[in-house]
Amino acid sequence: MRANSRTECEAERHKIQQAFLDGTSVHATLQALCEMAERNIQESLQASSRAHNLEPEGLAVLAIGGFGRRILFPYSDLDILLLFENGRAEQKLEAVLAELTRTLWDRGFRVSSAARTLDESKQVERENVEFHLSMMDRRFLAGDQTVYQKLEQKVLPRTEKVYRSFLHEELTKLTKRRLAKYGNTIFHLEPNVKDSPGGLRDFHASAWMRQVAGRASEIRGADIVERDLALNAVDFISQVRCFLHYQNGRNDNTLTYELQTIAAEESLGAKDGLKRNAAEWMRIYYRHARTLHHQLQRSLSLQSITAQ
């Protein structure tokens, strides 16, 4: 389908939502939302380039953060990086990018964009560490692929090596600060399934720690069992988060008492399909949350040992 209007985009979103409510897996749901966004970005860039009679030379559009991981929840922001070869390319394509962003907003996408030149990408902004963490999950979407290749092959390998220790320290600080905000416990009566201890952020923080430390592909012995448990937990909590977005009609990740009851009645995420009361269903949630939080605590401990 050529997604060339807000009406068509809304119809596609509704189709994806209905499929989720009818039992389509959360993985397939998030992939469908992601693919829809990618297609619209690519088509919109082509259309805006034609409208201004300019080729997007010197510009690469990258997906970062969750979108970079090929995960897009129903009401999440669309995190993109506009990467320019230099300042001249940025100035030349200013009108093209303004129209690209406007078109995406018109089609119902909540665009969260950042702009950098290749030279600017050589530095890590100390006051904006979260952006650089989101850059770990990056991939090319549209535009000039040679610019992206320069980033991957020439710029970031050196930058990540130079700033590895700093990113280690800042990621640890950010993680501990977030956990402290929620009392360092998974047991909240109405947990935030994204940011609370045991939420999806724990899983991503753990992955970032391994990546920063150069251990992204390490899987040994008991790690295989832990990985499988963590993936099951991510699947369950992702399903809960997707459910919350559709129930609330916005990017609200709080699992309220009312929604706990509805989730339990629907046997959300419970593979046996048995009906449970809210308290019984929440025990399943806490079991999965404990798995993700344990994995994060283990990553924090390993990082502490490495730093000594």
Protein language model features and the residues they cover:
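A nucleotide- and high-energy phosphate-metabolite-utilizing enzyme signature
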Residues: M1-Q308
